[in-house]
């Protein structure tokens, strides 16, 4: 019987053995992949996260363009329509944004990329998502540009063009990073 438990921010694997009790597997932490939660105010930490996200999302977009099915395209299109609806109705659309990016990773049909993306969503991606939130709240006029970036990614994937999909995904993430940096530069310093 194996359990995972959270305590003080760390993940441990506990094993129960009849007659022996419960113990922590000493190799689990050493072998477990973890990323510390990024600090939104740390620009170097942000750069490292963005490099990681670029390597994953550009690769995912390229594979999605090669492997996507009609069902995958339908999921992406639904998320795009949801984001468009959110824009028209002055809503954030962050859940639809997540669904769009998730559908791209799922279209790779690579279970390891999907699992890594799920991990990053739970632990890291919120930094990237804050770029969208800040753009929507403070720079509403830029949301149309964000939507256009998403449409470019989708069009390249739909056309089965991995190079264009990779370029569009990279441009989108670089623009998201710029939007986040702009927001951070305008934030008042903590007192």
Question: What residue ranges belong to the model's regions?
Answer:
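Conserved amphipathic alpha-helical segments that form helical-bundle/coiled-coil interaction surfaces
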Residues: 53-131, 149-152, 164-176
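Single conserved hydrophobic/aromatic residue that forms the stacking wall/gate
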Residues: 1-12
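Alpha-helix N-cap/N′ positions at the starts of helices
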Residues: 31, 41-44, 56, 78, ...
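Non-transmembrane, amphipathic alpha-helical segments
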Residues: 41-48, 68, 109, 138
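A short secondary-structure junction motif
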Residues: 30-31, 123-134, 179, 183
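C-terminal-biased regions
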Residues: 142, 147-155, 162, 166-191
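Short helix-coil transition/hinge motifs at the ends and kinks of transmembrane helices
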Residues: 38-39, 132-141
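HTH-adjacent hinge/linker in prokaryotic transcriptional regulators
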Residues: 13-51
């Amino acid at each position: 019987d194996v359990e995972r438990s959270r305590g003080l921010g760390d993940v441990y694997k506990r094993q129960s053995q009849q007659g022996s009790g419960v113990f922590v597997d000493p190799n689990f932490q050493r072998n477990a992949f973890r990323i510390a939660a990024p600090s939104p105010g740390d620009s170097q930490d942000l750069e490292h996260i963005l490099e990681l996200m670029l390597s994953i999302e550009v690769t995912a977009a390229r594979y999605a363009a090669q492997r996507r099915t009609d069902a995958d395209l339908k999921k992406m299109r639904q998320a795009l329509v949801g984001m468009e609806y959110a824009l028209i109705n002055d809503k954030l659309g962050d859940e639809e944004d997540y669904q769009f990016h998730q559908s791209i990773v799922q279209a790779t049909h690579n279970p390891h990329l999907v699992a890594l993306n799920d991990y990053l969503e739970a632990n890291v991606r919120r930094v990237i998502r804050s770029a969208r939130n800040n753009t929507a709240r403070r720079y509403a006029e830029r949301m149309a540009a964000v939507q256009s970036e998403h449409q470019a990614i989708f069009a390249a994937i739909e056309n089965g063009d991995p190079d264009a999909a990779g370029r569009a995904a990279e441009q989108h993430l670089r623009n998201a990073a710029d939007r986040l940096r702009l927001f951070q530069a305008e934030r008042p310093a903590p007192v």
